């Protein structure tokens, strides 16, 4: 018999809690106990994902984004933690510790782009290393193709939207930061990167990075993080072969792209 605690222990080995940022809230955030036969892996726990878990008879959801982040002052039926408890589904969430962990979110992203001799930077928030020379428009197009192939397709519009600020220099050294990493462009420059590929970057991040000689590619928060779900599922299957581990097909980018 596999327990919720056993699943949590595997996830703690994969993403050690001590790697989490001080402000974060990873862990076993909803514990309904009971036997576990089937697990659903996702980026976000949304009402749609809870319904998917119920339909697929999954009693544990393993997610990246914490389903409880700020202190709860009340619960109502529209709240996802309420829905989880009502359905008897436990939630294990590994956030910045999974970002920083070896084989975690950033390493999966680095693998996609063939980053060699990689090192961690920005306190584990990113990875940087060498790639075969490529132009920024070519790299952005490559990101579009690779990430779209690994994300759940939306009902309408493109699966992934990529935008870039190009200095005009070819990329030999690439930095990647999952999710909202645009503010860390200075750290990428300090590592000698020609380009930073991240999920989100604002207008001023792009202006400043380009002025300082760093190209910037923003490929979407969801798109740069969802690919880790397959890696987490594989790790769980290897550690607990008696479990059936599924990757969510209903966790999609909240944005629709034209």
Regions found by a protein language model. Name each.
Residues 1-258:
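Hydrophobic structural segments
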């Amino acid at each position: 018999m596999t327990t919720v605690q056993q699943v949590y222990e595997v996830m703690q080995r994969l993403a050690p809690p001590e790697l989490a940022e001080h402000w974060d809230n990873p862990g076993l955030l909803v514990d309904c106990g009971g036997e576990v036969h089937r697990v659903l892996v996702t980026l976000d726990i949304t009402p749609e994902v809870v319904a998917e878990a119920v339909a697929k008879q999954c009693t544990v959801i393993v997610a990246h984004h914490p389903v409880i982040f700020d202190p709860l002052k009340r619960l109502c039926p529209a709240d996802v933690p309420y829905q989880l408890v009502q359905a008897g589904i436990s939630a294990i969430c590994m956030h910045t510790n999974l970002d920083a962990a070896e084989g975690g979110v950033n390493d999966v992203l680095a693998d996609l782009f063939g980053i060699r001799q990689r090192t961690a930077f920005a306190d584990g928030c990113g990875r940087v290393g060498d790639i075969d020379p490529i132009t920024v428009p070519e790299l952005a197009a490559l990101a579009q193709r690779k990430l779209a192939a690994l994300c759940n397709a939306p009902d309408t519009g493109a699966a992934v939207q990529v935008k870039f600020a190009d200095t005009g220099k070819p990329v030999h050294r690439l930095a990647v930061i999952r999710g909202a990493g645009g503010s860390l462009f200075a750290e990428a420059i300090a590592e000698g990167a020609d380009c930073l590929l991240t999920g989100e970057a604002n207008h001023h991040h792009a202006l400043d990075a380009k002025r300082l000689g760093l190209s910037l590619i923003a490929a979407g928060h969801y798109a740069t993080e969802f690919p880790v779900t397959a890696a987490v599922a594989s790790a769980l299957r290897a550690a607990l072969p008696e479990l059936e581990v599924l990757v969510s097909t209903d966790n999609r980018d909240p944005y629709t792209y034209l």
